């Protein structure tokens, strides 16, 4: 059986990779160990969060599935960081895990050009430096010039609960044992990482009356630009805390922890530590937050977010029951840690194709990342580029100034993961004020439509939104708000100073405390003053006009984007100028054949790192660890000096 693209794995990376390739017309095969576990949420039942929510919005803008899937199956939706700047505001949704799996499978099964099979892939078929397909555990062969590995935690996965451990890709699923040794034989640098998960509690045994309730936002903020509205009833989460007794139980059993007893040597995510890590590392903290998150509408299971652990089951029970509201809680599934193999992502090109085997792509936790969203973003790009490789088209590579997806992949292929699972944060992006959640559609939907991932109707809606925001910006720049009692009463309600003379509406909106809604109220209740500055123009040259508020005011998403553009206009402009400087470095291409080892003036470390990674541009070289500004200057001088032709040996090998 022959295909254009084969995707190994049906987690969040595999879903996006398969759908992208199939939508682009590639005959695609998805292979998974278990057809009933497509889109499984192995850890917390949630999508989004700081940095992660930005990725989901970008995936959606490009035409990916994750945003639509969570909108269709979520049970609670919230905005995070609403009191902070717009660059770090993000959506987060609690998922109904069973519904998310079912919806993922339904979408995949109804996608043209996509076939789904249950099989355990044990070997890659590699010939003449290129992948030719895969072979399953029972000897089936599937042929394809491109293969995308999205293996998650399944490569030689080992689950730990206390001093007990067993082979598994996650609790309840077999590990994949054959691929790792073959990848190592092919020259891939294989390492070992760890992650963990929380015990699942029986919600019927929780005393919710003793806990702090956390409702969702109204109206629920959708992830997808294509979702019109979410009208389902939301389910609240609850908040509780560990205490001195909890910490005493953990410290008393720390010698039975596989992490602290030395059984587990690999490193886990720095920003998602186990509860035993938190207690041992932060001894001055009297308590730690525990968020009780329902796992779905049709189950009683509850996920105690913040209680990830690999302690023995008896210790987990004692620890849980020491917490307020959980005194009688029953554990339905124990928490555990899992070790698994990953591959050094610096052996990948920015397309996510491997440098060692032509046509072979890696995405997700195989590349050392952690999180559903990071995996989905990589899967989408790998699927796009595998389909384009089959057609002989150049790869799609997003820059750091274009998308968080670009930041994620550039970090991986340029810097690697530094020995611990990589998680996306807004702080990783240099131009985060330009890469906001609210403008992801404006940044990326045109590309999604060009790639045939985003339908034309959705692309037109994005264009219409941008036009409405631009139009309202222009209108508010021209309309004058009168210095009336009605205007000043509204300003006073907002805690803002009164005005003595007519003011352009856009200038009022620049005030931090003034919302777009307040501007609309001012323009409707107190119609703009019939005032014309000299020559009929205001001080920045736009025509001043008389009129009331718009017949069709902006909706919540449009208004949010307008407010940010207005209030942060100066900052946005400065970041845009910085991007232009960044582009100049990115546009200075570094030839693949460049001989760094023979480049005079470079340190031994720089020569080794540059030779290993082979950066595609001067900008990428500048971001590599161990590469100093002086080294970047040396490379630039080398290129400018005319020493940018390949040596004779390379010239002779060129066709």
At which residue positions do the language-model features occur?
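Core beta-strand elements of the Rossmann-like FAD/NAD(P) dinucleotide-binding domain
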Residues: 3, 137-146
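Conserved beta-strand-loop-beta-strand element in the redox core of flavoprotein oxidoreductases
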Residues: 125-141
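Internal hydrophobic alpha-helix adjacent to the cofactor/substrate pocket in enzyme cavities
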Residues: 375-396
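An anion/pyrophosphate-binding glycine-rich loop and adjacent beta-alpha core
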Residues: 34, 181-317, 325, 405, ...
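Conserved N-terminal/central alpha/beta ligand/cofactor-binding core
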Residues: 19-123, 150-170, 174, 178-179, ...
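Extended, charge-enriched "interface" segments that sit outside catalytic cores
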Residues: 428, 434, 440, 445-450, ...
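Beta1/beta-strand and adjacent pyrophosphate-binding region of the FAD-binding site
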Residues: 1-13
């Amino acid at each position: 059986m022959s295909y254009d693209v084969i995707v190994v794995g049906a987690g969040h990376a595999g879903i996006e990779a398969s759908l992208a390739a199939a939508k682009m017309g590639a005959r695609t095969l998805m292979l998974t160990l278990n057809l009933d576990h497509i889109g499984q949420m192995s850890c917390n039942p949630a999508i989004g969060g700081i940095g992660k929510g930005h990725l989901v919005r970008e995936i959606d803008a490009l035409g990916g599935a994750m945003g639509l899937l969570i909108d269709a199956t979520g049970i609670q939706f919230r905005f995070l960081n609403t009191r902070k700047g717009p660059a770090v505001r993000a959506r987060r949704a609690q998922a109904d895990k069973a519904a998310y799996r079912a919806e993922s499978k339904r979408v995949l099964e109804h996608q043209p050009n996509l076939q789904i099979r249950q099989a355990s892939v044990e070997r890659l078929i590699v010939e003449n430096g290129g992948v030719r397909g895969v072979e399953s555990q029972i000897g089936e062969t599937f042929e394809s010039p491109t293969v995308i590995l999205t293996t998650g935690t399944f490569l030689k996965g080992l689950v730990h609960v206390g001093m007990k451990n067993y082979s598994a890709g996650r609790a309840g699923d077999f590990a994949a044992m054959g691929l790792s040794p073959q990848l190592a034989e092919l020259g891939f640098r294989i390492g070992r990482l760890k992650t963990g998960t929380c015990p699942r509690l029986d919600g019927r045994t929780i005393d919710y009356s003793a806990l702090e309730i956390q409702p969702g936002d109204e109206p629920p903020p959708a992830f997808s630009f294509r979702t019109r509205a979410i009208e389902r009833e939301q389910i609240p989460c609850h908040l509780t805390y560990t205490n001195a007794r909890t910490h005493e139980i953990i410290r008393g059993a720390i010698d039975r922890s596989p992490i602290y007893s030395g059984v587990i040597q690999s490193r886990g995510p720095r920003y998602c530590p186990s509860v035993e890590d938190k207690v041992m590392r932060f001894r001055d903290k009297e308590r730690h937050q525990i968020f009780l998150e329902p796992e779905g509408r049709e189950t009683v299971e509850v996920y105690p977010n913040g209680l990830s652990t690999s302690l023995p089951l008896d210790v987990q029970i004692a620890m849980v029951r020491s917490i307020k509201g959980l005194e009688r809680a029953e554990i339905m599934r124990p928490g555990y840690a899992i070790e698994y193999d990953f591959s050094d992502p610096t052996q990948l090109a920015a397309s996510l194709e491997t440098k060692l085997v032509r046509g072979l792509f890696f995405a997700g936790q195989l590349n050392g990342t952690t999180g559903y969203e990071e995996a989905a973003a990589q899967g989408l790009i790998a699927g796009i580029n595998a389909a384009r490789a089959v057609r002989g088209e150049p790869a799609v590579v997003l820059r750091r100034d274009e998308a968080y997806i670009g930041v994620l992949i550039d970090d991986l292929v340029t810097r690697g993961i530094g020995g611990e699972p990589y998680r996306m944060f807004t702080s990783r992006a240099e131009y985060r004020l330009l890469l906001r959640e609210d403008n992801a559609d404006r940044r990326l939907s045109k590309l999604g439509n060009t790639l045939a991932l985003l339908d034309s109707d959705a692309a037109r809606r994005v264009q219409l939104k941008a036009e409405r925001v631009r139009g309202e910006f222009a209108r508010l720049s021209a309309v004058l708000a009168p210095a009336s009692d009605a205007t000043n009463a509204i300003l006073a309600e907002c805690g803002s100073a009164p005005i003595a003379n007519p003011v352009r509406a856009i200038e009022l909106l620049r005030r931090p405390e003034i919302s777009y809604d307040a501007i609309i109220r001012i323009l409707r209740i107190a119609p703009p003053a019939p005032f014309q500055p000299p020559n009929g123009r205001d001080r920045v040259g736009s025509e001043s006009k008389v009129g009331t508020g718009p017949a069709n005011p902006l909706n919540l998403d449009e208004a949010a984007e307008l407010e940010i553009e207005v209030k942060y206009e100066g900052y946005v402009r400065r970041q845009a100028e910085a991007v232009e400087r960044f582009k100049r470095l990115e546009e200075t291409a570094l030839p693949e054949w460049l001989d760094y080892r023979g480049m005079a003036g470079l340190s031994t470390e720089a020569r080794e790192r540059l030779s290993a990674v082979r950066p595609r541009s001067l900008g990428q070289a500048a971001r590599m660890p161990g590469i100093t500004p002086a080294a970047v200057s040396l490379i630039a001088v080398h290129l400018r000096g005319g020493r940018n032709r390949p040596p004779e040996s390379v010239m002779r090998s060129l066709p």
